[in-house]
Structure formats: C-alpha cells, structure tokens
C-alpha cells in the first residue's frame, strides 16, 4: 500500500489511513507548513493583503469563498445561510436597492453566519407566518380571556369623580355613602377577625 505524501510538509506519512491523515492535518507542524506554503506562493505572485481583492478582479465578486464579507447576499451566490435557513435569504423579484438594509442584512462585520449584533432581536419576526390564529378567527370572550370588567360592585369614588361628567360639580352621594359603608364594614370585619389574647 503506497504511503500518503503531504506536499505541504514534504514528508511521507507512516500510516496511510484516514485517521492518520486527519491526525496529521490537524497537527501544529502541518498547519504552520501550510501557512508558510501559501505565504510563499502569494509572495511569488506579488500579492499583498492590500492588493489581494484588486488582483482577483471580477472573480472576487462572484466567488463567496474569495470574498465572503463583501458578497454574502449577491443574487446567484450560494452562501452559508442557505444551507441551514433557506427562507432567511429569500428575495422578492421586485425588490428595491434598500431591501437588504430594510430587513437587517448588512454587508459588514455582523453579516457572518451565526453572529447576532448587540441590541438586535435574536429571533426576528417571521414575515410568512404572522397570523397567530388559524383563518384569522378572533378569540372568543370567555372567563379565561382578559375581558374588561364593566359591572363592578364597588367603585372608587375618586375614579368616579374623574370619569363621570355629570357629577363633576358635586360628588354622587350614593358613591360616598357606599364608601363609608364599605369602610365601616372593613373595620367591622377587622375587629371580628382579631384573635383574642
């Protein structure tokens, strides 16, 4: 069985198995040799980090691997979002130029997969499933919903005074007497509820 040759490290591996290759590829020496190999290759071509995108020309604008931060959302490109969440990158055919910015998909340092910018909603609203009730049928009013209470047995006289336009000049004597009765009943109940010593 032929031995595996690593062209970055310029050695033959003693164990030519998938496990041995993976272990070698994850090693410190292999990674440093790979970095050095590509640095030498770029140096020979005269490419520096400053002119790297200019060297690619139009190829960089059509290749998400060569230019991932600038071109995540260009039409026709398959990016990391499409694999796990195909609806996130859905574009309408009649979108305007500000469509990307209106839904929060910016081409900046926050546009990488899985990163949530500070202060943003981690789970954005789903525009395709806004209807919370089936067929838009409203909830029925029953004992378990928040139906407003209209007929209460006891009304606060201050609230009545503010809300009742007919009795703005003088307080309704019935409400005032109810307040006195309720106050007396409360004292009476409190006196009866006191425990003897």
Curated annotation (Swiss-Prot):
Record keywords, A-Z: Metal-binding, Nucleus, Ribonucleoprotein, RNA-binding, Zinc, Zinc-finger
Superkingdom assignment: Eukaryota
Compartments it resides in: Nucleus
Composition bias type Polar residues, residue spans: 142-154
Main localisation: nucleus
GO cellular component, one term: U2-type prespliceosome
Residue numbers spanned by region Disordered: 128-178
Family: Belongs to the U1 small nuclear ribonucleoprotein C family.
Role this protein plays: Component of the spliceosomal U1 snRNP, which is essential for recognition of the pre-mRNA 5' splice-site and the subsequent assembly of the spliceosome. U1-C is directly involved in initial 5' splice-site recognition for both constitutive and regulated alternative splicing. The interaction with the 5' splice-site seems to precede base-pairing between the pre-mRNA and the U1 snRNA. Stimulates commitment or early (E) complex formation by stabilizing the base pairing of the 5' end of the U1 snRNA and the 5' splice-site region.
HAMAP family listed in its UniProt record: U1_C
Assembly description: U1 snRNP is composed of the 7 core Sm proteins B/B', D1, D2, D3, E, F and G that assemble in a heptameric protein ring on the Sm site of the small nuclear RNA to form the core snRNP, and at least 3 U1 snRNP-specific proteins U1-70K, U1-A and U1-C. U1-C interacts with U1 snRNA and the 5' splice-site region of the pre-mRNA.
Name of the protein: U1 small nuclear ribonucleoprotein C
């Amino acid at each position: 069985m032929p031995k595996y040759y690593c062209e970055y490290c310029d050695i033959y591996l003693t164990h030519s198995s998938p496990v041995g290759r993976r272990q070698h590829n994850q090693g410190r020496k292999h990674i440093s040799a790979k970095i050095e190999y590509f640095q030498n290759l770029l140096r020979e071509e005269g490419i520096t980090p400053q002119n790297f995108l200019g060297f690619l020309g139009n190829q960089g604008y059509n290749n998400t691997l060569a230019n991932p931060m600038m071109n995540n959302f260009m039409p026709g490109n398959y990016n990391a979002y499409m694999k796990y969440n195909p609806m996130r990158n859905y574009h309408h055919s009649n979108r305007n130029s500000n469509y990307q910015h209106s839904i929060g998909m910016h081409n900046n340092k926050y546009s990488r997969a899985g990163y949530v910018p500070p202060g943003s909603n981690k789970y954005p609203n789903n525009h395709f499933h806004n209807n919370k009730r089936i067929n838009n049928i409203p909830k029925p009013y029953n004992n378990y919903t928040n139906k407003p209470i209209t007929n209460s047995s006891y009304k606060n006289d201050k609230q009545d005074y503010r809300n009742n336009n007919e009795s703005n000049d003088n307080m309704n004597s019935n409400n005032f007497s109810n307040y006195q009765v309720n106050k007396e009943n409360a004292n009476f109940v409190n006196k009866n509820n006191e425990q003897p010593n």
